[in-house]
Every structure is written in structure tokens, then in C-alpha cells.
């Protein structure tokens, strides 16, 4: 189950390629613009490799390091810990084929903030197991995060729905392995 934290903050997670197509720079720009509002309420965990130079420069330039934690490339053990620590998986892709990291997050019963592109529409149902926003729409992204900060009671139900939906995609053998993690 999830690792309980007592810092009263919402832990958001992104795991994937650090690449503008994955929407990660949209997230950072959204956070820079709304820093006053968000910096004491969330922690954003990032795992993955790619254009880390641009990312780190942006984080420094906008002084976001107090609430953004970059974990570098994460192996399976580290990734599992991040999935268990997170409250929400945020993956607002501009382009996506299937969204395997989203499915993985769903198997850990995480609510998802994503975009209705590619195969994601099969995974995330708006207001059921997460919130869908328009690709590149930073205002909607901010509103989705704000909504979940203000209504944390939705997190467990959305997470539960994510887990149920994930089961449809996982063959029973994998599901058993996930149960034993």
C-alpha cells in the first residue's frame, strides 16, 4: 500500500522521458507561474532521463528546487518506492502512443492527471480515475492540481478506480506478481 507521509503535502510524480512531448516542461512552467500558491502544498518527484540540462536550468532559474525533487534514472526498486510514496501521477503528454508508465501508476492505485492522446483514452476516464486536460493547457493543469489539493477525499476513490481499470490490462500472472510486491 501507499507509504504514509505526515508532511501534509500532496506528492506528485512523473516517471518517463524528460522530453517536451511528455509534457514535463508544461508542468514546470505551470509551477513557475503558480509558485506562490503551490510551493508549500506539493512536492513534485521526477524520475527519468533525457533533457535534464534544460530541466535543471529551468528549475534553478525559477527557484523551484524547494518543491521539486529530481531522482535521476530510477531502477525498479526505486521506482516502486516512488509509486508508493506518490499521491498523484502527473503525465500530461503532448504525444503518446500507449502510456505504459500511466498503466504502471494505475496498478499502484494512483489517480492520474493526463491528456486524452493516443492510448491514454483507454486508460484514464475523466473524473473517474483521474483528470484529463487538453495537451499543453497549463491553466487546466493548474486547476486539476488545485482541485485535488482542495479535495483530497477524491484521491482514494480515483486511485481505487485506477487499480480496477489496471486489472483489465494486466494478465492474471502479472497481477499476482504485483500483489506480492
Spans of model-derived segments:
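Conserved donor-binding/catalytic core segment of Leloir-type glycosyltransferases
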Residues: 4-22, 28-31, 45
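Short alpha-helical donor nucleotide-sugar binding micro-motif in glycosyltransferases
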Residues: 73-74, 81-86
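A short, well-ordered alpha-helix in the C-terminal region of glycosyltransferases
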Residues: 140, 147, 154-168
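Conserved acidic donor-binding segment of nucleotide-sugar-dependent glycosyltransferases
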Residues: 126-127, 131-138, 147-152
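Aromatic "clamp/platform" in nucleotide-sugar-dependent glycosyltransferases that forms part
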Residues: 94
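Nucleotide-activated donor-binding/catalytic signature segment of Leloir-type glycosyltransferases, i.e.
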Residues: 56-74
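Short hydrophobic beta-strand element within catalytic cores of glycosyltransferases
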Residues: 111-114, 124
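Glycosyltransferase donor-sugar binding loop
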Residues: 15, 43-56, 72
